[in-house]
Amino acid sequence: MNWRSEHIWIELITGSRKTSNFCWACILFLGSLGFLVVGTSSYLGKNLISVFPSQQILFFPQGIVMSFYGIAGLFISSYLWCTISWNVGSGYDRFDRKEGIMSLFRWGFPGRDRRIFLRFFLKDIQSIRMEVREGLFPRRVLYMEIKGQGAIPLTRTDEDLTPREIEQKAAELAYFLRVPIEVF
C-alpha cells in the first residue's frame, strides 16, 4: 500500500511476512519433524509412524542421519518463524517535499539496532538509478543515488517487477523528487 499527496510520498515495504515464507516455514517444519520422528523410531525400534516399519530403517547410519537432518531442519524452520514473527525487512520510505527530508525505516533483528532509521535531505539526492539485468536470472532493482552515501536500494532484490513496472515506479519517483533517472 502506498500513499501520495502533493508534498508527501509514503511507500510501505513488505518484510518477511510473505506467503512464500509462510509456505517454506511450514514445509520445512513438517518435513524436518518427519525426519526426526523416523530417526527416533529407528532408535527406539518402535513404529512411531505407521508408514515405515522400524525394522526397515537401521539406526546406524540411516537413523542417525535422518535425526540430524530433522534437528537441522527444525533449527532452520525456527529461524524462518522468528524472522516472520519479527517481520524483518518491513518498513517504509517517506519522501517529504515540504520539509525537504527523506526517511527510510526498516525493522531488523532484535537487539540494539532493531530499528533502522535513515534520514537524508532531498537536495542530496542526485538521481534515481535503475539496474536491469536480463537473462536466466533477471534482476531489476531501483536505487537512489545520494551525495557522499552512494546508492541506496529502494526495492528488494527478490521483488519480481516487470520492466514496465520498475520503469513506471522510477519515472514517478524521479518526477516527484525532481531528479534525473539513470539506467545501468
UniProtKB/Swiss-Prot annotation:
Biological-process GO terms, alphabetical: photosynthesis
Subcellular location: Plastid, Chloroplast thylakoid membrane
A cellular component annotation (GO) from this entry: chloroplast thylakoid membrane
TM ranges: 22-42, 57-77
Membrane-topology descriptor: Multi-pass membrane protein
InterPro entries on file: PSI_Ycf4_assembly (IPR003359)
Keywords assigned: Chloroplast, Membrane, Photosynthesis, Plastid, Thylakoid, Transmembrane, Transmembrane helix
Pfam families per the UniProt record, alphabetical: Ycf4
Similarity annotation: Belongs to the Ycf4 family.
Function: Seems to be required for the assembly of the photosystem I complex.
PANTHER family cross-referenced by the UniProt entry: PHOTOSYSTEM I ASSEMBLY PROTEIN YCF4, PTHR33288
Name under which the protein is recorded: Photosystem I assembly protein Ycf4
Organism from which the protein derives: Phalaenopsis aphrodite subsp. formosana (Moth orchid)
